[in-house]
């Protein structure tokens, strides 16, 4: 059978990995690598580890531990801890608001009996009685008075092993530390005009922001980090903390290095990125209540903006990756609203924006290093899209929000019909937010992400601002253009080739002779006979087959087989562990949702249509796994593909893998499969439709989903080449025997050929309809 080609592609995909491995080993053994650093390597040894480059940034990053600074008198900023690191005993800091608070801190060495000592406090000699009963720890005491002529009182001692102390002005109070390390805590003194309190430090000190108070407490209790305790750390003047205000030129060109022929230029640029999403909405056939696809697609946007008085023309191309496929099925009736697939971007998705402008930075963007960029975030909120039904209220998909966060930048190329542009690709990761999206008049609600229905929400564009910096190797003569690696500057875009090839393939459907098609569908086509219509050597044919398998193993069909294999493995292991589970021959089989059925028997599907649709997803895979003598949809699909490949004038080795994979997924989308049990036939379609009938009368009978599931497991699955509608029409107009009905139900190729040779218009019309569904 012609569908042997698809089965070979499914079973032989492992050869792709083997081929890649052999190719890599051969390349590694055969390649000679010569490293010539050149005059721009910064060092005579290769390979060169290039740095990140300079990016002008107005954002100030506040250090955790700022200092040490030399002793001085200053007005500490509020909400900042002044961490004192004294080396000898005595007064370490004092401060006053000159009104009602004079406060000083004194350090006393260990093991001091009660004694009188004289200290210089605020320019006066003051005698105080002090002591330190600890044998190992140093003692900090606060002394304060509330009037200029009053007496000092002692407060809040701190016994410290690291010999560190801290003070902070905040919220009308002066905060200090007290207690015993390593369990010291903060205390405070109330004061008026606290923000005007000047302090004099008599030892080195550090500055720590209040939001890092936990770190400050850690230092008080356990000491400074080791790097601060080396002799190489030298205190500097507090004036070093002052900011010199200069006007930065963000948009500038800097010559990094230069020789007679080449120079390295660093380009720093402000950029404004404007972009928008595009989508494809495809309505399914029928009465107008079904939609087959709502998906994102790339779009290029051209705009102008002003940068430092210069008008810039820019291009952006926006695309998405890692989309999530959702679907909605309102029921099995032709008038039930349904969406086969609609795409949503969420946290696991990425947005790519390729940016190019007509400035000097992009003119020679071929050899680039030290590429860096800083961009803002942007929030994208979806709008509303109404599904215009022939009758009744319109369902409306509305809402959805994602925020784009910059996640990297790389070099890329934007392709147009006439020129290829070296550009930058900005990658954005996503987070979801409110509002969620929903479809009115359905149960779809409170879902998060941005659906493809109306991602721009009537906006002309979204906008992101930021900066970029890069170093580019360019000719020393500015009039020269950097030579490009290849000589072809205008590239035939692969997507454009595929578009033209799809149009050609679809037009060739009229030229296929049905009798030849049936014969071709019965041939055991393998991969090489399938592709023999392309003029190429044997080696090229082998390479082509490998390329087809590389692409095919990423197809939806191959992914479904892989998922099914995993599910069967899970089922086998689960059955062996549980004696309460029914055998795999029952409806909880690999051809239903086996892993779900095994792990949660109590969970059942609510409606017959949903159960049937769940099983129907597996029917094609079951048919591939259990080949019968009858003809199937894949036989016709492969035969049509072979015929069109032979007739095509545009097929090439580069487009063939895409075409073969796309054909396996999109040819004959409206498939119905059947199983036969004596005189009863059960049919289920990929669209969720299901029915049962008797062979002799074609009268419908109640559909037993449990019986259908059991039959799918135990009986062969047959492609409904001749559907029930055609069979009824054939019986009413020509009359057929029960045996002929059985043969047509089994898709017997011999009987089909007889009807076609007899020019039976009903059978011919059905086969022609299937051929016309073989579209890309």
UniProtKB/Swiss-Prot annotation:
Example of a GO cellular component annotation carried by this entry: membrane
Keyword terms, alphabetized: Capsid protein, Coiled coil, Disulfide bond, Hemagglutinin, Host cell membrane, Host cytoplasm, Host cytoskeleton, Host endoplasmic reticulum, Host membrane, Host-virus interaction, Membrane, Outer capsid protein, Viral attachment to host cell, Viral penetration into host cytoplasm, Viral penetration via permeabilization of host membrane, Virion, Virus entry into host cell
Region annotation Spike body and stalk (antigen domain): where it falls in the sequence: 248-479
Spike head: region residues: 65-224
Region entry Hydrophobic, spans: 389-409
Residues marked Binding to sialic acid (site): 101, 190
Presence of the UniProt keyword Disulfide bond in the record: yes
Motif KID motif location, chain numbering: 644-646
Site (Cleavage): 231-232, 241-242, 247-248
Single GO BP term: virion attachment to host cell
Keyword Acyltransferase: no
InterPro entries reported in the protein's UniProt record: ConA-like_dom_sf (IPR013320), Rota_A_VP4 (IPR042546), Rota_VP4_MID (IPR035330), Rota_VP4_MID_sf (IPR038017), VP4_concanavalin-like (IPR000416), VP4_helical (IPR035329)
Cystine pairings recorded for this chain: 203-216, 318-380
Additional observations: In group A rotaviruses, VP4 defines the P serotype. Some rotavirus strains are neuraminidase-sensitive and require sialic acid to attach to the cell surface. Some rotavirus strains are integrin-dependent. Some rotavirus strains depend on ganglioside for their entry into the host cell. Hsp70 also seems to be involved in the entry of some strains.
Protein name: Outer capsid protein VP4
Annotated source species: Rotavirus A (strain RVA/Pig/Mexico/YM/1983/G11P9[7])
Top-level taxonomy: Viruses, Riboviria, Orthornavirae, Duplornaviricota, Resentoviricetes
